[in-house]
Amino acid sequence: MADTFFFTPSRRLTVANVAELTGAKLLNPEFSNIVISTLSSLEGAGEGSLVFVEHRKFSDALLGSSAVAVFCTNEIVFKVPESMAILVTSTPQRDFAQIGRILFPDSVKPMPWFGQREISPYAHIHPSAKFGHDVCIEAGAVIGKNVEIGSGSLISSTAVIGENCRIGRDCYIAPKVTVQYSLIGDRVYLYPGTCIGQDGFGYVGGASGIEKVPQLGRVIIKDGVEIGANTTIDRGTFEDTIIGEGSKIDNLVQIAHNVKIGRYCLIAAQCGIAGSTSIGDMSQLGGSVGVADHIVIGKCVQIAAGSGVMNDIPDGEKWGGSPARPFKQWFREVAALRNIGKVKKEKR
């Protein structure tokens, strides 16, 4: 269950409220007045717990669960115990998350580390900086010359915002974040240790050694983007590095200079995207994917974890392996290798 020491529910909902808010169909109306007070996993459920089951392979766990209500699809209904309210929906996890945001709004809205929304007298702020209303800047933050920060944004202790940067409305800049040479939209969350706008890895070799190439572009992060802890995004060499609207980037990701990431992309931890690569809207990269430079990845592409992308990928395709290739080809090759191993073992 949710830890009530850190996360206190803001309200209580009945099962009928939950059905109305999400549009789910309540199959057993006699449970309408049951109170939902928390979210849980199937195994950790207790009094007042709401759970979800999206895939049939997890449905057996319902039998031993103490949850009072479950979001599930039509195909799982017959597995649900009679003691649970059944909320049928085609998107159980999405509806579960929606109710979570209603019950625990503080869990998705970053709060000031010191509990007060104010501009601290112990922040280091250049006199030319401009702020919208209800901006919070905590002690130890550094705000450079000509910086502009939109209404409702929170700049945490030890964050550094470099000269001329723009931060939009309702943004969250966590501790130890550095932002330079960047324009950041509204509702952008940068989690601890993120570095935005530093030099790209631009060097050229010659007889006299390695020379640095000036990095003269920017980073542009559009509305609704979230960037995980200790991720780094380099500014462009001449063109901008761009992160598209609504994209979510996990912890420990490296995005090199001139990269263009489209709208609503998902990039999991430890990915590395080399310079001047572009990724189309709604594409997804699993953990530890490496992408070579100047690659074009289309829209709605899925790339399996641990893959190494060395070639362009058309729209809508699923690739995996290293070097990455279409799923069907990759699976055939893996199966062939497995069979070779079996033959050798039999000969022994």
From Swiss-Prot:
Which molecular-function annotation in GO is an example for this chain? N-acyltransferase activity
User: Its domain of life?
Assistant: Bacteria
Annotated EC: 2.3.1.191
Q: Which InterPro entries match?
A: Hexapep (IPR001451), Hexapep_transf_CS (IPR018357), LpxD (IPR007691), Trimer_LpxA-like_sf (IPR011004), UDP_GlcNAc_AcTrfase_non-rep (IPR020573)
Q: In which pathway does it act?
A: Bacterial outer membrane biogenesis; LPS lipid A biosynthesis
> Keywords on this record?
Acyltransferase, Lipid A biosynthesis, Lipid biosynthesis, Lipid metabolism, Repeat, Transferase
* Alphabetical GO biological process terms: lipid A biosynthetic process
What is the active site of this protein?
A: 257
Show the GO cellular component annotation of the record: membrane
Q: Which Gene3D superfamilies match?
A: Hexapeptide repeat proteins (2.160.10.10), MurE/MurF, N-terminal domain (3.40.1390.10)
Cited Pfam families: Hexapep, LpxD
Q: Which residues cross the membrane?
A: none
Give the catalytic activity.
Answer: a UDP-3-O-[(3R)-3-hydroxyacyl]-alpha-D-glucosamine + a (3R)-hydroxyacyl-[ACP] = a UDP-2-N,3-O-bis[(3R)-3-hydroxyacyl]-alpha-D-glucosamine + holo-[ACP] + H(+)
Could you tell me what this protein does? Catalyzes the N-acylation of UDP-3-O-acylglucosamine using 3-hydroxyacyl-ACP as the acyl donor. Is involved in the biosynthesis of lipid A, a phosphorylated glycolipid that anchors the lipopolysaccharide to the outer membrane of the cell.
Q: Which HAMAP family match?
A: LpxD (MF_00523)
Task: Kindly state the subunit structure of this protein.
Answer: Homotrimer.
Q: Which family does it belong to?
A: Belongs to the transferase hexapeptide repeat family. LpxD subfamily.
Protein name (Swiss-Prot/TrEMBL): UDP-3-O-acylglucosamine N-acyltransferase
The organism is Bartonella quintana (strain Toulouse) (Rochalimaea quintana)
**Lineage, please?**
Bacteria, Pseudomonadati, Pseudomonadota, Alphaproteobacteria, Hyphomicrobiales
